[in-house]
Amino acid sequence: MIPLLVKFPTRQRPDRFRYALNLLVKNMALPGDVHFLFTLDRNDPTVAELMTIINQLCAGTRAGYTIVEGDSTGKINAVNRDLPEFDKPWQSVIVASDDMHATPAWDRWATSAMAEYYPDGDGYVWFGDGFQKDICTIPLMGRAEYDRLGYIYN
């Protein structure tokens, strides 16, 4: 069972992606508890570069990762895409983005928040990004909540 699945869609911003992913990887406290699910668009002209970045930064860690190439119809679709077909069991999922930068032990903080507030996985933790007050741009969701709603982001 994967304690924390990180859903990371990306498109056409390899430099920003590299920076954000490097912070996620470098600041993991529990790499064996983290699995990244990367969503890439097959028509993205930078897809090969993005794959190289992922393999360079993730291969040397204990974190697992899966790369899926496909077709997204927009940002919301890209965030939600690929998760229904992901075949490894997981407890919680958090959305990552190339404009959000991880702080030290971000993964421990996320798993601790879920354990404290929704130990049964039936809930959603609202993390503010410092910019939006009315939109949850960094959703963290338990599996039971995801199964009920059928999406992470809308």
Predicted regions and their residues:
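Short, acidic, metal-binding catalytic loop of nucleotide-sugar glycosyltransferases
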Residues: N22-D33
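A short, glycine-/small-residue-rich helix N-cap motif at loop->alpha-helix starts
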Residues: G70-A78
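Active-site nucleotide-sugar/metal-binding loop of Leloir-type enzymes
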Residues: N80-S92
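Short beta-strand-to-loop acidic/aromatic patch adjacent to the donor-nucleotide binding site
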Residues: W90-H101
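Aromatic-glycine-rich donor-binding/catalytic loop that engages nucleotide-sugar donors
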Residues: R143-N154
